């Protein structure tokens, strides 16, 4: 049984648990063990009004800490009843934390567990995760289990995966079975952080917990990220039999994965399953399919999908057009590529720099230099070009066609326009000069490349050695080593 399949073993009835958002947020006494006194109940209104007044002062006065006591000399700000009312009336939880720290530093104030839990929960509700972590570290108190579960979720969402796992383990050591939401949040955090080993370690500990659509989504994503796309598909089919639909993202993930490995039969099955479950493929998914087909030299099949999209009333965007144009260029079908190019422009989609470079590269492969220069000049007129991508495309193309001097002109213009040449730029020029027996120019660039701390390619090194007609030992003695 595959790893993914073995995890879909059983489903458990939902456990009754506290909702962390339904904890006490309206503190009236510091301890639940103490009954409210009549005078405390009578003063509740005054505490509420005072809390509103202080909240306003904190928002509007920059140095409220220096004047608050003198403004209200007879008021006991350390009264736990007041602090509870302040937490309710203050919209900004960071202001509440600020007041708490001021209270602790100016009064002999020892907050009780209820106040601490309320403030900690408010920080989590406000997604102030780092502040909540600092608060927990400085106070050293032990939050309620429901808050710890919420804390795990917040840490995971913030990308603090190891911290989330640590708190999750604290709950486990306390004998508390975390909810399916908490478990899923930790697993999803591992996926986002690309920690697949940690994902599978944790999931093995969770095999008896509840399964839901989110868990299936996490498992399939993990299998696809690990290269087990087929196992992910099998898990999808099992989940759907149980009525667990993982959503459009998972279908897109599987489709992309099958496209990358060239399994178009399974890709088609996933696409039809997706539609059957009322998830209509987005243009992004169709772009992935077209790209995958083109990568596997199936441009005709890709164009059939592209054409069907238009026939069915879809409007392919610039990315889809560029993907199809690139596929045609890679195949050498430049006439078809240009036809789509002008169709795209006619529909109001302006080509971007990447699209121009696709066409330039395609025409370089065919040796159509005049068309290359036409596209390049048009790109410059439209405000593109002058970047590392476009400069390297032109330099490599010119050098491959014996036009290293033209390539060198672009190289010189790079520094004038603030574009710093990289190793690809230098290596292309070195090979280009050597190809035209301009070894001195190539050697000069080689030394410049080394001086900049960049690494020459093996092909550039071999071209120099070959044209200088020297052995590797002589080249090494002249400091022409690769590394």
Swiss-Prot record:
InterPro entries: Pentatricopeptide_rpt, PPR_P_subfamily, TPR-like_helical_dom_sf
Keywords of this entry: Repeat
PPR repeat residues: 144-178, 179-213, 218-246, 247-281, 282-316, 317-351, 352-386, 387-421, 422-456
SUPFAM superfamilies referenced in this protein's UniProt entry, alphabetically: HCP-like
Pfam families named among the record's database cross-references: PPR, PPR_2
Source taxon at top rank: Eukaryota
Family as reported in the entry's similarity comment: Belongs to the PPR family. P subfamily.
Name by which UniProt lists this protein: Pentatricopeptide repeat-containing protein At5g18950
């Amino acid at each position: 049984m595959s790893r993914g399949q073995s995890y879909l073993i059983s489903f458990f009835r939902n456990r009754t648990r506290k909702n962390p958002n339904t904890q006490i947020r309206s503190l009236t006494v510091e301890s639940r063990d103490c009954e409210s006194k009549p005078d405390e109940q009578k003063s509740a209104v005054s505490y509420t009004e005072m809390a509103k007044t202080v909240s306003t002062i904190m928002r509007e006065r920059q140095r409220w800490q220096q004047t608050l006591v003198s403004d209200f000399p007879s008021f006991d700000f350390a009264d736990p009843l007041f602090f509870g009312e302040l937490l309710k009336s203050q919209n900004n939880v960071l202001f509440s934390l600020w007041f708490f720290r001021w209270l602790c530093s100016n009064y002999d104030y020892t907050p009780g567990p209820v106040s601490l839990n309320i403030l900690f929960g408010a920080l989590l509700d406000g997604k102030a995760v780092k502040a909540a972590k600092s608060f927990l570290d400085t106070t050293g108190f032990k939050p309620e289990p429901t808050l710890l579960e919420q804390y795990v979720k917040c840490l995971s969402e913030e990308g603090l995966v190891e911290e989330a796992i640590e708190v999750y383990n604290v709950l486990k050591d306390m004998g508390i079975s975390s909810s399916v939401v908490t478990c899923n949040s930790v697993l999803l955090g591992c996926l986002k952080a690309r920690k697949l080993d940690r994902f599978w370690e944790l999931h093995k500990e969770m095999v008896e917990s509840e399964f839901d659509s989110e868990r299936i989504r996490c498992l399939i994503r993990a299998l696809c990220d690990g290269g087990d796309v087929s196992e992910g598909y099998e898990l999808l089919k099992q989940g759907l039999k149980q009525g667990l639909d993982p959503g459009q993202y998972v279908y897109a993930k599987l489709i992309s994965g099958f496209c990358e490995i060239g399994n178009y039969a399974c890709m088609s099955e996933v696409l039809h399953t997706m539609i059957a479950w009322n998830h209509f493929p987005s243009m992004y998914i169709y772009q992935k399919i077209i790209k995958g087909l083109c990568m596997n030299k199936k441009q005709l099949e890709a164009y059939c999908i592209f054409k069907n999209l238009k026939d069915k009333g879809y409007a392919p965007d610039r990315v889809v057009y560029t993907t199809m144009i690139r596929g045609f260029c890679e195949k050498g079908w430049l006439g078809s590529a240009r036809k789509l190019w002008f169709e795209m422009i006619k529909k109001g989609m302006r080509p971007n720099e990447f699209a121009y470079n696709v066409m330039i590269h395609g025409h370089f492969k065919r040796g159509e230099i005049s068309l290359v220069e036409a596209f390049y000049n048009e790109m410059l007129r439209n405000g593109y070009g002058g970047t590392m991508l476009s400069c390297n495309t032109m330099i490599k193309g010119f050098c491959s066609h014996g036009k290293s001097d033209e390539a060198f002109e672009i190289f010189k213009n790079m520094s004038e326009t603030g574009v710093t040449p990289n190793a690809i730029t230098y290596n292309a020029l070195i090979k280009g000069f050597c190809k035209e027996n301009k070894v001195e120019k190539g050697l000069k660039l080689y030394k410049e490349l080394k001086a900049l701390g960049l690494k020459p390619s093996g092909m550039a090194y071999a071209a120099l050695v070959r044209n200088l007609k020297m052995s590797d030992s002589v080249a090494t003695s002249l400091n022409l080593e690769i590394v």
